């Protein structure tokens, strides 16, 4: 038997041992499903009827997808509200070449739509906070590139802790500063992580472009993402609306609930947001977008829409 045979044999032994441990684990942790109903235990954030479980109160946003009449869910025209304002009204209120994500961010954070001078000041703050140091891009974003951008975001957010001179301070003032920095920096981290993935995993040309002052967040994402930096006004508008619609979905969704749980321990902002990103990544939450994209790709490549 040569060294390769020994390696294969050891690998087979390990696989057999792991199979045994897995079966033992599954046998040792089983709870009668009927006990959940008997003790009225909620398995997740919905009860047995599909209704959301009340875990807290919020005025930030609300989602309405159905009415409950006599204990039955009746489909209704969906509605999404930010600080009591219908999102449709927010989007319809955008005129000309205005972009609305930054205004929506201000609304969600501070509870009211910004005046012209307030918006200008807010945009200036975000612009000043968006820069990533070359050292961070080189040592964090480019190292150990991930095939999943959500995983890359989670890792980068955790590492931002070490670049913060006051990471443990959870006062309102400092937490707001950290939140604004994350809002400003995450688009860059997402785009750069994607380029790192394409370069190191797909052998594509590496492209890193700095954001350009004066562009909206949606415009800068496309500007940094595209090799030639070009995009149409329609593309930027569609992305801006998508960002608005994804900005917040009520205080009871999985990732927001994760934030409540993790921050209740008094931990730092970066740990809380990283945990929430991990929750958002799941296929039953934000990761469902990838599943939907996969369905479209399947329809596109199938000879017939009816083919599996």
Short names for language-model regions:
Residues 83-102, 239-240, 252-279:
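Short, hydrophobic/aliphatic alpha-helical segments
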Residues 300-308:
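Single conserved hydrophobic/aromatic residue that forms the stacking wall/gate
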Residues 2-25, 172-176:
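Beta-strand-enriched accessory nucleic-acid recognition/scaffold domains that flank the catalytic cores
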Residues 140-250:
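Glycine-rich, mobile lid/loop segments that gate access to catalytic sites or pores
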Residues 106-114, 266-294:
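Conserved phosphate/anionic-ligand binding catalytic regions in large, soluble enzymes, centered on
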Residues 296-298:
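Helix-rich, well-folded core regions that mediate interactions or catalysis
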Residues 16, 21-23, 27-136:
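An N-terminal structural lobe/cap that precedes and organizes the functional/catalytic core
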Residues 62-75, 124, 236-253, 260:
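An acidic intrinsically disordered interaction segment
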